[in-house]
C-alpha cells in the first residue's frame, strides 16, 4: 500500500513538474542532450537543436561534410570518425507498377469506346492510335 501511494505521488509530481517550470529557467530537454528555456507562462519553450551523441553513427567521413543516408541528413564530426544524423523513419519507395497494358486492339473500335477483352476478364478502352489500354488483371 505504501509503495502504491509513493508511486502515485511520484507520478503526480513528475506530471506537474513536466507541465510547469520557473520562468527564465534553463531545463534539460526530454532527449537528455538539448536545453530548453522556461517561458514567462511557466511552460517549456524554445529548445536547442543540437545533434546528440545517441544519434551518432560511427564511420570515417570528411569533417563537417553533410550527406544523406536514406531520408536522413547527417553531418560528419570534427574528427571525421562519426556522423550525427537525424532519425526519421524512412519508407522505402516501391517501384511504380503500371495498372494498364497498351496493346493492339482486339477489334475495330472508336476512340474512347470501352469494351471487355475476349477472355471477358479485362476492361479496355480504345485509343486514338488504334491501340487499346486494358487493365492488368490475372484471370
Swiss-Prot record:
InterPro entries: Pacifastin_dom, Pacifastin_dom_sf, Prtase-inh_pacifastin
Endpoints of the signal sequence: 1-18
Main location: secreted
Family under the similarity heading: Belongs to the protease inhibitor I19 family.
Keywords for the protein's UniProt record, in alphabetical order: Cleavage on pair of basic residues, Disulfide bond, Protease inhibitor, Repeat, Secreted, Serine protease inhibitor, Signal
Residue intervals of the Pacifastin domain: 19-55, 58-93, 106-139
Tissue: Expressed by the venom gland.
Disulfide bonds: 21-38, 33-52, 36-47, 61-76, 71-90, 74-85, 109-126, 121-139, 124-134
Subcellular location: Secreted
Residues marked Reactive bond (site): 87-88
GO molecular function: serine-type endopeptidase inhibitor activity
Entry GO terms, CC: extracellular region
Function: Inhibits trypsin activity and prophenoloxidase (PPO) activation, an enzyme essential for both clotting and insect innate immune responses. It does not inhibit activity of chymotrypsin and protease K, and has no effect on phenoloxidase (PO) activity.
Short name of one Pfam family: Pacifastin_I
Protein name in the entry: U-reduvitoxin-Pr21
Organism, scientific name: Platymeris rhadamanthus (Red spot assassin bug)
Domain of life: Eukaryota
